[in-house]
Protein backbone atom coordinates (compact mmCIF):
# COMPACT_ATOMS: atom_id res chain seq x y z
CA UNK A 1 0.00 0.00 0.00
CA UNK A 2 1.32 3.46 -0.96
CA UNK A 3 2.47 5.98 1.65
CA UNK A 4 -0.48 8.01 2.94
CA UNK A 5 0.67 11.45 4.11
CA UNK A 6 -2.81 12.36 5.39
CA UNK A 7 -3.01 9.34 7.71
CA UNK A 8 0.66 9.64 8.72
CA UNK A 9 0.02 13.20 9.88
CA UNK A 10 -2.98 12.07 11.92
CA UNK A 11 -0.89 9.31 13.49
CA UNK A 12 1.98 11.64 14.39
CA UNK A 13 -0.43 14.22 15.82
CA UNK A 14 -2.11 11.55 17.95
CA UNK A 15 1.21 10.31 19.34
CA UNK A 16 2.30 13.82 20.32
CA UNK A 17 -1.11 14.54 21.86
CA UNK A 18 -1.09 11.31 23.87
CA UNK A 19 2.27 12.24 25.41
CA UNK A 20 0.89 15.65 26.43
CA UNK A 21 -2.36 14.14 27.69
CA UNK A 22 -0.52 12.08 30.32
CA UNK A 23 0.24 15.29 32.21
CA UNK A 24 -3.27 16.78 32.15
CA UNK A 25 -4.78 16.65 35.64
CA UNK A 26 -8.31 15.45 36.39
CA UNK A 27 -9.71 18.93 37.07
CA UNK A 28 -8.62 20.16 33.67
CA UNK A 29 -9.87 17.04 31.90
CA UNK A 30 -13.26 17.50 33.53
CA UNK A 31 -13.32 21.19 32.58
CA UNK A 32 -12.96 20.18 28.91
CA UNK A 33 -15.81 17.69 29.27
CA UNK A 34 -18.03 20.30 30.94
CA UNK A 35 -17.37 22.77 28.14
CA UNK A 36 -18.04 20.15 25.46
CA UNK A 37 -21.26 19.26 27.26
CA UNK A 38 -22.36 22.90 27.13
CA UNK A 39 -21.49 23.04 23.42
CA UNK A 40 -23.87 20.14 22.76
CA UNK A 41 -26.67 22.38 24.03
CA UNK A 42 -25.48 25.68 22.55
CA UNK A 43 -24.89 24.18 19.10
CA UNK A 44 -27.79 21.72 19.13
CA UNK A 45 -29.43 23.34 16.08
CA UNK A 46 -26.20 23.06 14.10
CA UNK A 47 -25.83 19.42 15.17
CA UNK A 48 -29.37 18.61 14.04
CA UNK A 49 -28.80 20.47 10.77
CA UNK A 50 -25.68 18.38 10.06
CA UNK A 51 -27.55 15.22 11.02
CA UNK A 52 -30.42 16.12 8.69
CA UNK A 53 -27.87 16.42 5.89
CA UNK A 54 -26.79 12.83 6.63
CA UNK A 55 -30.42 11.66 6.69
CA UNK A 56 -31.12 13.24 3.30
CA UNK A 57 -28.05 11.60 1.77
CA UNK A 58 -28.76 8.19 3.32
CA UNK A 59 -29.59 5.69 0.59
CA UNK A 60 -30.24 1.98 0.79
CA UNK A 61 -30.01 1.71 4.56
CA UNK A 62 -32.63 -0.17 6.56
CA UNK A 63 -35.02 1.42 9.06
CA UNK A 64 -33.13 0.23 12.14
CA UNK A 65 -29.89 1.79 10.89
CA UNK A 66 -31.76 4.96 9.95
CA UNK A 67 -33.16 5.12 13.48
CA UNK A 68 -29.65 4.80 14.94
CA UNK A 69 -28.42 7.51 12.60
CA UNK A 70 -31.14 10.05 13.32
CA UNK A 71 -30.60 12.62 16.08
CA UNK A 72 -33.19 14.76 17.85
CA UNK A 73 -33.27 16.95 20.95
CA UNK A 74 -33.99 13.95 23.19
CA UNK A 75 -30.96 12.05 21.87
CA UNK A 76 -28.76 15.11 22.35
CA UNK A 77 -30.03 15.34 25.94
CA UNK A 78 -29.08 11.68 26.39
CA UNK A 79 -25.61 12.41 25.03
CA UNK A 80 -25.26 15.25 27.52
CA UNK A 81 -26.43 12.95 30.32
CA UNK A 82 -23.72 10.44 29.38
CA UNK A 83 -21.06 13.17 29.49
CA UNK A 84 -22.23 14.25 32.94
CA UNK A 85 -21.89 10.66 34.17
CA UNK A 86 -18.37 10.45 32.76
CA UNK A 87 -17.45 13.69 34.54
CA UNK A 88 -18.54 12.10 37.84
CA UNK A 89 -16.17 9.15 37.39
CA UNK A 90 -13.23 9.07 39.78
CA UNK A 91 -9.86 9.63 38.16
CA UNK A 92 -9.00 6.34 36.42
CA UNK A 93 -5.32 7.31 36.19
CA UNK A 94 -2.63 6.83 38.80
CA UNK A 95 -4.67 4.37 40.86
CA UNK A 96 -2.79 1.65 42.72
CA UNK A 97 -4.49 -1.54 41.53
CA UNK A 98 -2.32 -3.89 43.56
CA UNK A 99 0.81 -3.80 45.68
CA UNK A 100 3.14 -6.49 47.01
CA UNK A 101 6.56 -6.96 48.55
CA UNK A 102 9.17 -9.29 47.08
CA UNK A 103 11.26 -11.58 49.35
CA UNK A 104 14.20 -9.22 48.86
CA UNK A 105 12.15 -6.32 50.24
CA UNK A 106 11.41 -4.70 46.87
CA UNK A 107 7.91 -3.19 46.80
CA UNK A 108 6.05 -3.56 43.49
CA UNK A 109 2.93 -1.59 42.55
CA UNK A 110 0.55 -2.06 39.65
CA UNK A 111 -0.67 1.45 38.72
CA UNK A 112 -3.28 2.42 36.12
CA UNK A 113 -1.97 4.41 33.15
CA UNK A 114 -3.40 5.34 29.73
CA UNK A 115 -3.21 2.88 26.83
CA UNK A 116 -1.88 5.63 24.54
CA UNK A 117 -3.52 6.07 21.13
CA UNK A 118 -6.80 4.30 20.37
CA UNK A 119 -8.21 3.85 16.88
CA UNK A 120 -11.99 3.53 16.79
CA UNK A 121 -13.93 2.33 13.73
CA UNK A 122 -17.70 2.43 14.08
CA UNK A 123 -20.99 2.54 12.19
CA UNK A 124 -24.20 4.58 12.15
CA UNK A 125 -24.47 6.02 15.66
CA UNK A 126 -23.31 9.67 15.93
CA UNK A 127 -23.59 9.48 19.73
CA UNK A 128 -20.57 7.14 19.69
CA UNK A 129 -18.45 10.12 18.60
CA UNK A 130 -19.50 12.03 21.71
CA UNK A 131 -19.28 9.10 24.15
CA UNK A 132 -15.95 7.72 22.96
CA UNK A 133 -14.28 11.12 22.74
CA UNK A 134 -15.29 11.82 26.34
CA UNK A 135 -14.28 8.38 27.63
CA UNK A 136 -10.91 8.41 25.88
CA UNK A 137 -10.07 11.91 27.07
CA UNK A 138 -11.16 11.14 30.64
CA UNK A 139 -8.88 8.08 30.67
CA UNK A 140 -5.93 9.98 29.21
CA UNK A 141 -6.01 8.40 25.76
CA UNK A 142 -5.79 10.10 22.39
CA UNK A 143 -8.28 8.74 19.86
CA UNK A 144 -8.54 8.57 16.08
CA UNK A 145 -12.17 8.28 14.99
CA UNK A 146 -13.42 6.73 11.78
CA UNK A 147 -17.21 6.70 11.71
CA UNK A 148 -19.50 5.30 9.06
CA UNK A 149 -19.85 7.41 5.91
CA UNK A 150 -23.63 7.53 6.46
CA UNK A 151 -23.05 9.66 9.60
CA UNK A 152 -20.21 11.77 8.19
CA UNK A 153 -21.59 15.26 8.81
CA UNK A 154 -22.97 14.40 12.26
CA UNK A 155 -19.66 12.88 13.37
CA UNK A 156 -17.70 15.79 11.90
CA UNK A 157 -19.54 18.49 13.83
CA UNK A 158 -19.43 16.53 17.11
CA UNK A 159 -15.69 15.92 16.82
CA UNK A 160 -15.15 19.57 15.84
CA UNK A 161 -17.02 20.72 18.95
CA UNK A 162 -14.87 18.49 21.17
CA UNK A 163 -11.72 19.88 19.53
CA UNK A 164 -13.09 23.39 20.07
CA UNK A 165 -13.47 22.62 23.79
CA UNK A 166 -9.91 21.25 23.92
CA UNK A 167 -8.49 24.34 22.24
CA UNK A 168 -10.48 26.64 24.55
CA UNK A 169 -8.99 24.91 27.61
CA UNK A 170 -5.44 25.08 26.17
CA UNK A 171 -5.22 21.33 25.51
CA UNK A 172 -3.90 19.75 22.32
CA UNK A 173 -6.94 19.52 20.06
CA UNK A 174 -5.40 16.45 18.43
CA UNK A 175 -6.29 14.43 21.51
CA UNK A 176 -9.40 13.83 19.38
CA UNK A 177 -9.07 13.44 15.61
CA UNK A 178 -11.73 12.53 13.08
CA UNK A 179 -10.79 11.02 9.72
CA UNK A 180 -12.73 13.42 7.50
CA UNK A 181 -11.88 11.77 4.19
CA UNK A 182 -14.26 9.02 3.13
CA UNK A 183 -11.87 6.81 1.14
CA UNK A 184 -11.76 3.22 2.41
CA UNK A 185 -8.02 3.27 1.69
CA UNK A 186 -7.65 5.37 4.83
CA UNK A 187 -9.29 2.62 6.90
CA UNK A 188 -6.96 -0.01 5.44
CA UNK A 189 -3.98 2.23 6.16
CA UNK A 190 -5.19 2.82 9.72
CA UNK A 191 -5.41 -0.93 10.32
CA UNK A 192 -2.25 -2.13 8.62
CA UNK A 193 0.29 0.69 8.35
CA UNK A 194 0.16 2.59 11.64
CA UNK A 195 1.38 0.27 14.43
CA UNK A 196 4.07 2.81 15.37
CA UNK A 197 1.31 5.28 16.25
CA UNK A 198 -1.69 3.24 17.37
CA UNK A 199 -1.72 1.02 20.47
CA UNK A 200 -5.11 -0.63 20.02
CA UNK A 201 -8.02 -0.70 17.56
CA UNK A 202 -11.62 -0.94 18.74
CA UNK A 203 -14.27 -1.77 16.12
CA UNK A 204 -17.90 -1.12 16.97
CA UNK A 205 -20.47 -2.44 14.55
CA UNK A 206 -21.74 -5.56 12.81
CA UNK A 207 -20.06 -8.95 12.40
CA UNK A 208 -18.65 -8.09 8.97
CA UNK A 209 -16.89 -4.99 10.32
CA UNK A 210 -15.40 -6.90 13.27
CA UNK A 211 -14.21 -9.68 10.95
CA UNK A 212 -12.51 -7.26 8.54
CA UNK A 213 -10.79 -5.36 11.35
CA UNK A 214 -9.49 -8.52 13.01
CA UNK A 215 -8.20 -9.85 9.69
CA UNK A 216 -6.37 -6.68 8.61
CA UNK A 217 -5.21 -5.07 11.85
CA UNK A 218 -1.50 -5.10 12.66
CA UNK A 219 -2.12 -3.89 16.22
CA UNK A 220 -4.12 -5.46 19.08
CA UNK A 221 -7.91 -5.41 18.59
CA UNK A 222 -10.57 -5.19 21.29
CA UNK A 223 -13.59 -6.59 19.46
CA UNK A 224 -16.87 -8.35 20.07
CA UNK A 225 -19.10 -10.76 18.19
CA UNK A 226 -22.82 -11.34 18.73
CA UNK A 227 -22.87 -9.57 22.09
CA UNK A 228 -20.63 -7.80 24.56
CA UNK A 229 -20.86 -10.44 27.28
CA UNK A 230 -17.57 -10.43 29.16
CA UNK A 231 -16.91 -12.20 32.45
CA UNK A 232 -14.13 -11.07 34.78
CA UNK A 233 -13.00 -13.64 37.32
CA UNK A 234 -11.54 -12.01 40.43
CA UNK A 235 -8.81 -13.85 42.33
CA UNK A 236 -11.19 -14.22 45.31
CA UNK A 237 -13.98 -15.79 43.21
CA UNK A 238 -15.29 -19.34 43.54
CA UNK A 239 -13.55 -20.94 40.54
CA UNK A 240 -15.99 -23.85 40.28
CA UNK A 241 -18.88 -21.40 40.03
CA UNK A 242 -16.93 -19.25 37.56
CA UNK A 243 -16.34 -22.25 35.28
CA UNK A 244 -20.07 -23.01 35.27
CA UNK A 245 -20.89 -19.40 34.40
CA UNK A 246 -18.38 -19.31 31.54
Residue ranges of each PLM-predicted region?
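N-terminal Rossmann-like NAD(P)+-binding subdomain of aldehyde/semialdehyde dehydrogenases
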Residues: 1-110
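ALDH superfamily catalytic-core signature
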Residues: 13, 124-142, 161-168, 210-246
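A structured beta-alpha segment of the ubiquitous adenosine-cofactor-binding alpha/beta core
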Residues: 72, 85, 103-110, 177-195
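General beta-strand structural signal in soluble alpha/beta enzymes
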Residues: 95, 145, 177-180, 202-205, ...
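Short, charged beta->alpha transition segments
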Residues: 100-109, 122-134, 189
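A glycine-rich phosphate/pyrophosphate-binding beta-strand-loop-alpha-helix module
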Residues: 113-116, 123-181
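Active-site/ligand-binding-proximal alpha/beta "capping" segment
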Residues: 188-200, 206-215, 237, 244
Amino acid sequence: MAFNSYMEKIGKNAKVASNDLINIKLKRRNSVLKLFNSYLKVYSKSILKANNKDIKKAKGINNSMLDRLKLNNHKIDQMRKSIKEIIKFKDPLGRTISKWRRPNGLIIKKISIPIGVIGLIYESRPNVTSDVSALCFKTGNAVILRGGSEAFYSNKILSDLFRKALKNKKCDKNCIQFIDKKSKKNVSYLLSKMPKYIDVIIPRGGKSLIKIVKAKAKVPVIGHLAGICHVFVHKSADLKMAIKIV
